[in-house]
Amino acid sequence: MDELTPRQSEILAWIRARMAEDSLPPTRAELMRAFDFRSPNAAESHLRVLARKGYILLQSGTARGIRLCASEEETGLPLIGRVAAGQPMLAEEFREGQLPVDPKLFSPGADYLLRVQGMSMRDAGILDGDILAVRHDASLTLQDGQMVVARVNGEVTVKRWKRDGKQVWLLPENPDFSPISVDLQRDSLTIEGVVVGLLRIGGNL
């Protein structure tokens, strides 16, 4: 790979650190703010140089489309600590490690793995302790019935998505649990990803 300038090395080190900390690639806007670039185009220009020199890959059509090249990253997918799949809990995300799972095993490809806690998605075949493969892509248009990882007022839960205008319902797959009602004009809602697969350690995929 071509040698980097000090500035390019600084940007690459920042990208690595962000991905290690958050387990997700940074956005162009985050890069722009971190380095006080005057425009997104300046951030994009630096990213394209890193890509041309073989340090990163750029995926079009997504805000978090930065990927470290194979020689720059660990193999597999990062495993994020337990997430509520029952009543939502205050999520303090942490990285448990890296699992040797090919992202391309799933369609669309997964960005990270997330451990489930609780039985609210039992009837969808998701049990306590299972590991979900999650695609984090802000450009995806959610369809009713899709399974999502949602952060509601700071708390994380795994549920099925249903929307009617400004009203969202996060639906469990277990009659012992109640739907979560979200008013988009009042509540804070962030979609942390769409579930694209299931892993059960010691069992079948």
Curated annotation (Swiss-Prot):
EC number(s) from the headed UniProt entry: 3.4.21.88
UniProt DNA-binding region: 28-48
InterPro entries, per the entry: LexA, LexA-like, LexA/Signal_pep-like_sf, LexA_DNA-bd_dom, LexA_repressor, Peptidase_S24_LexA, Peptidase_S24_S26A/B/C, WH-like_DNA-bd_sf
Active site residues according to the UniProt entry: S120, K159
Residues at the site labelled Cleavage: A85, G86
Molecular function in Gene Ontology: DNA binding; serine-type endopeptidase activity
GO biological process, one term: proteolysis
Pfam families linked: LexA_DNA_bind, Peptidase_S24
Keyword line: Autocatalytic cleavage, DNA damage, DNA repair, DNA replication, DNA-binding, Hydrolase, Repressor, SOS response, Transcription, Transcription regulation
Chemical reaction(s) catalysed: Hydrolysis of Ala-|-Gly bond in repressor LexA
Family: Belongs to the peptidase S24 family.
Task performed by this protein: Represses a number of genes involved in the response to DNA damage (SOS response), including recA and lexA. In the presence of single-stranded DNA, RecA interacts with LexA causing an autocatalytic cleavage which disrupts the DNA-binding part of LexA, leading to derepression of the SOS regulon and eventually DNA repair.
Oligomer and partners: Homodimer.
Cited PANTHER family: LEXA REPRESSOR (PTHR33516), LEXA REPRESSOR-RELATED (PTHR33516:SF2)
HAMAP family referenced in this protein's UniProt entry, alphabetically: LexA
Record protein name field: LexA repressor
Native organism: Acidithiobacillus ferrooxidans (strain ATCC 23270 / DSM 14882 / CIP 104768 / NCIMB 8455) (Ferrobacillus ferrooxidans (strain ATCC 23270))
Underlying gene: lexA
